């Protein structure tokens, strides 16, 4: 039983590492990569996205999006600078269940874009410190 527990823990650590390094980026179709966020840099969208994030995302990624033992930080260079808005949108709509990321398509596009706006605002907040 201990061996099963250790194997499960190792699998979770591997899962977090693979997700953190952005392996999901390779799954995004080219047609989705260039989508642009209609709410980018809008303060109202940041506030709305923060509420949605806390309701749906914080339990895995942490209240401050710094990540948890089981899920990666969303303040990484990969998420903040390397991934396009379209790639982030695709991930939220489609999920990446093999790595523990569910689809949030039930939220609808406005809320998904607001979450992206909020998450991207964390980079600006961090840079201004």
Q: What does each model-found stretch correspond to?
A:
Residues 17-21, 39, 68-76, 93-129:
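Axial heme c-ligation environment in periplasmic c-type cytochrome domains
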Residues 49, 53-63, 115-119:
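The canonical Cys-X-X-Cys-His
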């Amino acid at each position: 039983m201990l061996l099963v527990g250790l194997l499960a823990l190792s699998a979770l650590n591997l899962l977090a590492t693979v997700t953190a390094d952005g392996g999901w980026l390779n799954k995004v179709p080219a047609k989705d990569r260039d989508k642009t966020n209609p709410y980018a840099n809008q303060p109202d969208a940041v506030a709305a996205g923060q509420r949605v994030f806390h309701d749906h995302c914080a339990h895995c990624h942490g209240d401050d999006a710094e990540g948890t033992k089981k899920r990666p930080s969303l303040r990484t260079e990969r998420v903040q600078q390397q991934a396009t808005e379209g790639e982030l949108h695709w991930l939220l709509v489609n999920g990446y269940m093999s790595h523990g990321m569910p689809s949030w398509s039930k939220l609808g596009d406005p809320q998904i874009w607001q979450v992206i706006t909020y998450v991207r605002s964390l980079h600006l907040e961090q840079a201004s410190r």
